[in-house]
Amino acid sequence: MATVPELNCEIAAFDSEENDLFFEADRPQKIKDCFQALDLGCPDESIQLQISQQHLDKSFRKAVSLIVAVEKLWQLPMSCPWSFQDEDPSTFFSFIFEEEPVLCDSWDDDDLLVCDVPIRQLHCRLRDEQQKCLVLSDPCELKALHLNGQNISQQVVFSMSFVQGETSNDKIPVALGLKGLNLYLSCVMKDGTPTLQLESVDPKQYPKKKMEKRFVFNKIEVKTKVEFESAQFPNWYISTSQAEHRPVFLGNSNGRDIVDFTMEPVSS
């Protein structure tokens, strides 16, 4: 962040009429105290800005006026070529601004202090260990069933986003959205039981690096299989039933539920 330092020398104040004259379209008529030389009249010489080594006592408005003046110089209609380049102002910016780091001690859920970085995504299909595919049955419900032939195209493609969360050697936080749809798997409490649902989101806001915890799953690799544990409800996993054509749900791995999946990457 750039701030204007307090300086220790007097400079004449500009009033609005002087500023209007200073920024006249024809050309600047005079520049007070800021430059030792500024020659616009000689067609054989380029514009040269010379900065006094003595710090000047400028308010922020005067500093901005200087920058606006330079912008006006760029736009002046002159018949002679100028060698005034974009990099020229950099020589005196250090006299006006001081650079300070922006520090953040904590993160909060309203994302006001979170600067999202580009999200790494992987498109994939998931099948349970019985080779049942996941399909979108109702507008907001996934079901697991066996597909073959032309029906194989019905299985959903997930957009797996690698998000912020508690990362360990065997757990990677991810969010699971349905590719091409504004739907994400999320975990909420319903009637006292952790429940898996498909939640509609604003595509302008999602995906993002810091997803709400209900959207986050810990991807756990077990040999050639993967499991997805809810970050909101530890020890509860995305599960399928032993039976055919049953909804995908959140289970607590009691031995009857299927929690192991194979992941098939899909080109984007």
UniProtKB/Swiss-Prot annotation:
Family stated for the protein in its record: Belongs to the IL-1 family.
Role played: Potent pro-inflammatory cytokine. Initially discovered as the major endogenous pyrogen, induces prostaglandin synthesis, neutrophil influx and activation, T-cell activation and cytokine production, B-cell activation and antibody production, and fibroblast proliferation and collagen production. Promotes Th17 differentiation of T-cells. Synergizes with IL12/interleukin-12 to induce IFNG synthesis from T-helper 1 (Th1) cells. Plays a role in angiogenesis by inducing VEGF production synergistically with TNF and IL6.
Propeptide section residues: 1-116
InterPro entries: IL-1_CS, IL-1_fam, IL-1_propep, IL1/FGF
Gene Ontology terms describing biological process: astrocyte activation; cellular response to antibiotic; cellular response to fatty acid; cellular response to glucose stimulus; cellular response to interleukin-17; cellular response to lipid; cellular response to lipopolysaccharide; cellular response to mechanical stimulus
PROSITE patterns xrefs: INTERLEUKIN_1
Record GO terms (molecular function): cytokine activity; integrin binding; interleukin-1 receptor binding; protein domain specific binding; receptor ligand activity
A GO cellular component entry from the record: extracellular space
Keywords carried by this UniProt record: Cytokine, Cytoplasm, Inflammatory response, Lysosome, Mitogen, Pyrogen, Secreted
Induction conditions: In pancreatic islets, release is increased by high glucose treatment and, to a lesser extent, by endocannabinoid anandamide/AEA. The induction is more pronounced in Zucker diabetic fatty (ZDF) rats compared to lean animals.
Protein location: Cytoplasm, Cytosol; Secreted; Lysosome; Secreted, Extracellular exosome
Important for interaction with integrin (site feature) positions: 171, 179, 190, 204
Name the record gives this protein: Interleukin-1 beta
SMART domains reported in the protein's UniProt record: IL1
Chief localization: cytoplasm
Quaternary data: Monomer. In its precursor form, weakly interacts with full-length MEFV; the mature cytokine does not interact at all. Interacts with integrins ITGAV:ITGBV and ITGA5:ITGB1; integrin-binding is required for IL1B signaling. Interacts with cargo receptor TMED10; the interaction is direct and is required for the secretion of IL1B mature form. Interacts with HSP90AB1; the interaction facilitates cargo translocation into the ERGIC. Interacts with HSP90B1; the interaction facilitates cargo translocation into the ERGIC.
UniProt KW Secreted keyword: yes
UniProt key word Magnesium: no
Transmembrane spans: none
Note: IL1B production occurs in 2 steps, each being controlled by different stimuli. First, inflammatory signals, such as LPS, stimulate the synthesis and promote the accumulation of cytosolic stores of pro-IL1B (priming). Then additional signals are required for inflammasome assembly, leading to CASP1 activation, pro-IL1B processing and eventually secretion of the active cytokine. IL1B processing and secretion are temporarily associated.
Superkingdom assignment: Eukaryota
One Pfam family it belongs to: IL1_propep
SUPFAM superfamilies cross-referenced by the UniProt entry: Cytokine
